[in-house]
Amino acid sequence: LTEETKYLINDYSISKMKDGVMIINTGRGQLIHTNALIEGLKNKKIGSAGLDVYEEESEYFYEDQSDRIIDDDVLARLLSFNNVIVTSHQAFFTHEAMENIAATTLQNIKDFINHKPLLNEVKK
């Protein structure tokens, strides 16, 4: 996510879309301004939405919250629409993705042990 792509989907961009558009986001939660998405759903400009990400997801998406009341009113409102599905960061969870994650992790461990450059090293 960059400053240029943050809230790429917003009130203005939604107003330029065809009526009844379907919005899918499996990238980054902050690509979509959630309140603008909700307004688009309410006024039927947006026909449906499929979201694997949410801009405030860290509080809700990484552990079981089924025994807890959602205190994020924006997320609760979003979940109230029958034409919205939120999959809580599950789109990545495929056999191929898990194999790639495991292979990358093992390669990084091997490279670290052998004092080779790490392809996925995050530097401060």
Say what each PLM segment does:
Residues 1, 29:
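Short donor-sugar binding/catalytic loops of nucleotide-sugar-dependent glycosyltransferases
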Residues 20, 30-124:
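Rossmann-like dinucleotide-binding domain for NAD(H)/NADP(H)
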